[in-house]
Structure formats: C-alpha cells, structure tokens
C-alpha cells in the first residue's frame, strides 16, 4: 500500500535539510504516520542523526548509501530509493507521509516524479544573498523553497530584502519562506504547507 504523500527534501550540503526533516518529524509524529529515507554518499550519517535525536522510531528511518553523485540516486536511477520507500510502506501500512532527504547537491538537483510527489528545496543565507537569483530547478520549480539560517544574515553580509525580491522574481507565485530552524522560526509555514498537501 502506498503512503498518502511522498515528499522530497533537497538542497546543498549544510543548508538544513536534516534539521528540517527532524523538525517536521517532531511536529507531526503525534498526528501522522511518518517514515523517512535519507541519502548520503558513503555513510548513513543523516539517518543515524535522526535516530539519535529521537525524531522517529529507528525502524521508521532508512539510510541509503548512494556511493556516487547524489542527484543520480534521486533522479536518473532512483531504484535504491524507491526500494527503501516501498519497504517502509510495506512494513507500515497506512503511512501518511514519507520524507525522502537527498544527499547534499547543487542547485540543479531535482527528484524523479517516480520517487516523490512534491519537493521542498532548502537553501541557506550563509551561502550569500545571490543564491535565489542563480536559479536552477530547486529555486524555480520546487513546490516550496525554504531559505534557512536567516539569523546568520548580518554575519555574512547577506541582505534578506534582496533575497526576498530575487525569490519573488524567480518563483513568481510559487510558495517560499524564511526560516531559522534552530529556533523553529518560520517552521509553522512549512508545517502548514505539508499538511495541506496530504490527501484526506
């Protein structure tokens, strides 16, 4: 039996993908049936982090070692991820949401529609305020763009106003939000978005 929603979470290394998955698990686990698949190139570091932090029960988390380019495992040949998702859906019938976190990648990363229904793309302010205007599928076509680490703007000389203007121009009417996932600022917007996507 398939889950109600398969949600991809992508973005560059260190942008806050795992922090977002962890925060959503904590917010939603008492209301929804959840599972997570994480991707790392040579380790299962993100899966182990989620397990250690108690985001979900260990059996609801699968770590995939891609062994190569991160976007290949979520786009060109996503069979290893599809197998992990199917395994979770078989083990836990009635899942509401399976989150698939990609390995850290560049702005060209995108998920295969065979793997996920929707994608959240995470970037961070520390990479500079020019990132939104650089474009790429994650910036322009993701279902939700999350601009994380807004608390670091003053330390790296990033202008949130510039980022907002560029994001509005690049995304037109597609949703996006600023977050500081360490304090959960802006997380309500992400949670609301996810809940709206899950079929009744």
Curated annotation (Swiss-Prot):
<dbReference type="GO" id="GO:0003924">
    <property type="term" value="F:GTPase activity"/>
</dbReference>
<comment type="similarity">
    <text>Belongs to the SIMIBI class G3E GTPase family. UreG subfamily.</text>
</comment>
<dbReference type="GO" id="GO:0005525">
    <property type="term" value="F:GTP binding"/>
</dbReference>
<comment type="subunit">
    <text>Homodimer. UreD, UreF and UreG form a complex that acts as a GTP-hydrolysis-dependent molecular chaperone, activating the urease apoprotein by helping to assemble the nickel containing metallocenter of UreC. The UreE protein probably delivers the nickel.</text>
</comment>
<dbReference type="Pfam" id="PF02492">
    <property type="entry name" value="cobW"/>
</dbReference>
<comment type="function">
    <text>Facilitates the functional incorporation of the urease nickel metallocenter. This process requires GTP hydrolysis, probably effectuated by UreG.</text>
</comment>
<dbReference type="InterPro" id="IPR003495">
    <property type="entry name" value="CobW/HypB/UreG_nucleotide-bd"/>
</dbReference>
<keyword id="KW-0143">Chaperone</keyword>
<protein>
    <recommendedName>
        <fullName>Urease accessory protein UreG</fullName>
    </recommendedName>
</protein>
<keyword id="KW-0996">Nickel insertion</keyword>
<keyword id="KW-0547">Nucleotide-binding</keyword>
<dbReference type="GO" id="GO:0016151">
    <property type="term" value="F:nickel cation binding"/>
</dbReference>
<dbReference type="GO" id="GO:0043419">
    <property type="term" value="P:urea catabolic process"/>
</dbReference>
<dbReference type="InterPro" id="IPR027417">
    <property type="entry name" value="P-loop_NTPase"/>
</dbReference>
<keyword id="KW-0342">GTP-binding</keyword>
<keyword id="KW-0963">Cytoplasm</keyword>
<dbReference type="InterPro" id="IPR004400">
    <property type="entry name" value="UreG"/>
</dbReference>
<feature type="binding site">
    <location>
        <begin position="11"/>
        <end position="18"/>
    </location>
    <ligand>
        <name>GTP</name>
    </ligand>
</feature>
<dbReference type="GO" id="GO:0005737">
    <property type="term" value="C:cytoplasm"/>
</dbReference>
């Amino acid at each position: 039996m398939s889950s109600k929603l398969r949600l991809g979470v992508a973005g560059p290394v260190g942008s806050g993908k795992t922090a977002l998955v962890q925060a959503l698990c904590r917010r939603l686990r008492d209301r929804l049936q959840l599972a997570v698949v994480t991707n790392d190139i040579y380790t299962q570091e993100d899966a182990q982090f989620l397990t250690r932090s108690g985001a979900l029960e260990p059996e609801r988390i699968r770590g995939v070692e891609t062994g190569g380019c991160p976007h290949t495992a979520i786009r060109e040949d996503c069979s290893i991820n599809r197998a992990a998702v199917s395994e979770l859906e078989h083990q836990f019938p009635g899942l509401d949401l399976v989150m698939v976190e990609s390995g850290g990648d560049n702005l060209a990363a995108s998920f295969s529609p065979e793997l996920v229904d929707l994608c959240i793309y995470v970037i961070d302010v520390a990479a500079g305020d020019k990132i939104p205007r650089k474009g790429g599928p994650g910036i322009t076509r993701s279902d939700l763009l999350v601009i994380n680490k807004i608390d670091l703007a003053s330390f790296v000389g990033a202008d949130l106003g510039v980022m907002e203007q560029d994001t509005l121009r690049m995304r037109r009417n597609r949703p996006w939000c600023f977050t500081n996932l360490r304090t959960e600022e802006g997380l309500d917007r992400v949670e609301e978005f996810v809940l709206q996507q899950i079929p009744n």
